[in-house]
Amino acid sequence: MDSRKLSPRGKKLESHLSQEHRRPPLGLIAAWGQPSIQSSVQQGLQTQDWVCEPPERRRPGRRWSVSIDERRRLATLGGRERPGAAGTQLHCRDVVQMVAQLVSEDVDKDVLLPHPLRSTESTNAFQAFLARSAPFWHNATFEASRSPPS
């Protein structure tokens, strides 16, 4: 027989260990990154509020976690503000689309964009677009100067 089960002191130790080192149900193990196992067990299988980096991929000294609200915000943005190479390509594509829309609406080329997100990339994309559309600007300016105001 185990001596811990017989003595009152052992019962306290056993109950303390069982509370701290309790194994969560399989569903909770699969949903790693919960704020605490004990609170997750009490809440049952509810929506996970935080997503954390899996321990097997974590490098020493590096941790990240994203709240579910932040995940929703990023999802509604469609990836436009996500950092990295893909975000850079999306950003440049957005700038080109905004400039193309301004051109199609006969907006003057000197109009400033409302919120330049990355000045160097925005400037380069805008300048490249202007270089490609120089004949259009020349024709539009020439036609505007020829036609009388209505």
Swiss-Prot record:
Q: Does the keyword Cytoplasm apply?
A: yes
Tell me the keywords, alphabetical order: Cytoplasm, Cytoplasmic vesicle
Subcellular location per the Swiss-Prot or TrEMBL entry = Cytoplasm; Cytoplasmic vesicle, Secretory vesicle, Acrosome
Give the start-end ranges of region Disordered: 1-26
Q: GO CC terms for this protein?
A: acrosomal vesicle
- Specify residue ranges for compositional bias: Basic and acidic residues: 1-23
Protein name per its UniProtKB record: Testis-expressed protein 22
Instruction: Give the gene that encodes this protein.
Output: TEX22
